[in-house]
C-alpha cells in the first residue's frame, strides 16, 4: 500500500511537508483578507443593516446552541474512540493519539464553521448594497464571503493533518501513525453533519411554520422581511 511506503523522518522536512504547512497559512491569510474586504462594506440604508444584523445574531445564537448540544456527544465519542483503540492496539499511546486526532478534527471544523457563519450572515446586506453598482460588484462581494468558509475549512484541516503527521510519524512506526491520524476525519464530519442536518431542519420548520403561513393567511409575500419567520428561515439557511 502507498501509505505504508511513506516514512519521512521528522528531521528531514521534505518539500511536500513544507508546502503542506505554507499552503494552509496562505489560505487562511486569503480567507482573512476576503473577510475583511466584505466586512468593511457599510450599507447606508438603515433597513438593510437592521435586517442583516437580526439574521447575523440569530445565526450566531443558533450555532452556539448547536455547539453546546454537540459538546457532550463529541466528548462521549472521544472516550469511545480511546477505548476502541486501546482494545484493538493494546496501547495507551495509540489510544491517546487517536482521541486527540478526533478532538482536533472536531475543533478545527467548529472553528471554520463559526468563521464562515460570521462572514456569510453579514454579507447579504452588503451584497445587496453593492448591487446598486451592477452585477459585478455584487457577485464579487458574495463570492468573497463564500470563500471564507471554504478556504478556512480546507486550510485548517490541512494544517492539522500536517502537524499531526509530523508528530505521530516521529513516535509511531509507519502503519500505526496512519491509524492514529484517521479519526481527524471523523471529528470533522461530526460537526459538519450536525450543522448541515440541524440547519436544514430549522430552516424548513421556519419556512413552513411561519413564512408559508404568513403568505397564505396574512397575505404577506414569501421572504418578505415584515414576517419574523423570514428571519428564522434565513438563520437556518
Predicted regions: what they are:
Residues 1-7:
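Short, Lys/Arg-rich, polar N-terminal cytosolic tail immediately upstream
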Residues 10-236:
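Hydrophobic, small-residue-rich transmembrane alpha-helices and their short perimembrane loops
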Amino acid at each position: 500500500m502507498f501509505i505504508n511506503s511513506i516514512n519521512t523522518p521528522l528531521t528531514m522536512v521534505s518539500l511536500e511537508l513544507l508546502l503542506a504547512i505554507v499552503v494552509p497559512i496562505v489560505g487562511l491569510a486569503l480567507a482573512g483578507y476576503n473577510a475583511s474586504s466584505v466586512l468593511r462594506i457599510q450599507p447606508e440604508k438603515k433597513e438593510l443593516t437592521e435586517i442583516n444584523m437580526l439574521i447575523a445574531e440569530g445565526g450566531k445564537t443558533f450555532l452556539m446552541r448547536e455547539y453546546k448540544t454537540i459538546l457532550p456527544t463529541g466528548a462521549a465519542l472521544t472516550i469511545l474512540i480511546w477505548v476502541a483503540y486501546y482494545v484493538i492496539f493494546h496501547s495507551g499511546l495509540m489510544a491517546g493519539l487517536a482521541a486527540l486526532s478526533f478532538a482536533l478534527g472536531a475543533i478545527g471544523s467548529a472553528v471554520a464553521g463559526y468563521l464562515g457563519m460570521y462572514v456569510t450572515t453579514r454579507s447579504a446586506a452588503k451584497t445587496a448594497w453593492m448591487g446598486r453598482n451592477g452585477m459585478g460588484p455584487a457577485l464579487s462581494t458574495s463570492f468573497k464571503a463564500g470563500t471564507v468558509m471554504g478556504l478556512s475549512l480546507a486550510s485548517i484541516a490541512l494544517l492539522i493533518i500536517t502537524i499531526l503527521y509530523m508528530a505521530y510519524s516521529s513516535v509511531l512506526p509507519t502503519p500505526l501513525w496512519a491509524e492514529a491520524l484517521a479519526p481527524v476525519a471523523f471529528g470533522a464530519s461530526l460537526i459538519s453533519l450536525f450543522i448541515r442536518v440541524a440547519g436544514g431542519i430549522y430552516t424548513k420548520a421556519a419556512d413552513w411554520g411561519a413564512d408559508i403561513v404568513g403568505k397564505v393567511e396574512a397575505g404577506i409575500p414569501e421572504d418578505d422581511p415584515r414576517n419574523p419567520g423570514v428571519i428564522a428561515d434565513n438563520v437556518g439557511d
